[in-house]
Amino acid sequence: MTELGPVAWPPAPIRSERLVLRESEARDRAAFIELFASPEVRTYLGGPRPRDELERAVPEIPGRRPGFFVVALDGAMIGTITLLDRRDAERPGHVRLEAGEAELGYMFLPEAWGCGYAAKACAAALDWFADALPGEPVVLCTQTANDRSMHLAAKLGFTEVERFEEWGAEQWFGVWSLVTPFG
């Protein structure tokens, strides 16, 4: 068991028609570095990090923590999904008074964009989450300027709760669940 309470981690790999969501492995390291060094991927996430810094900082097996999925296509990592990071109470955007909601995050390599992989992978992760922690809301926060992410949020069924300024940009905050937001 982990800090997820009754949820054992890692789960068995989650398989869709073409994708596998799994725990990270050593063979994923180069793709992790590419994700964090990519100006395209990091446009709305604080910008790219220097590749030489990443080569030094990224561990041999990156991303090994509860709630972190590698998205693989034909065995190769094309992206990541985080699902069990709990939203900090000091940050804006919550659907529960006590905060601590699970927050969906995702990054995909540019060559995987426009193929529907993000929608399929996120939907599979959300289905897993709903089975593992029934009734728990999932939140998502993205810059309103990020058209691809806004489209994905709508496609996944997230409902807008509010918009606010954070990190120097307007943020869209939504929830995926039957939970009614407070406020």
Model regions and ranges:
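GNAT-family acyltransferases
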Residues: 1-111, 124-128, 132, 137, ...
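Conserved G/P- and acidic residue-centered "switch" motifs that form tight phosphate/ATP-binding loops
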Residues: 75, 116, 146
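Generic domain-boundary/flexible-linker signal
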Residues: 92-94, 115, 149
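A short helix-loop-beta submotif of the ANL/AMP-binding
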Residues: 112-119
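Conserved active-site alpha-helix within GNAT-family acetyltransferase domains
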Residues: 119, 145-160
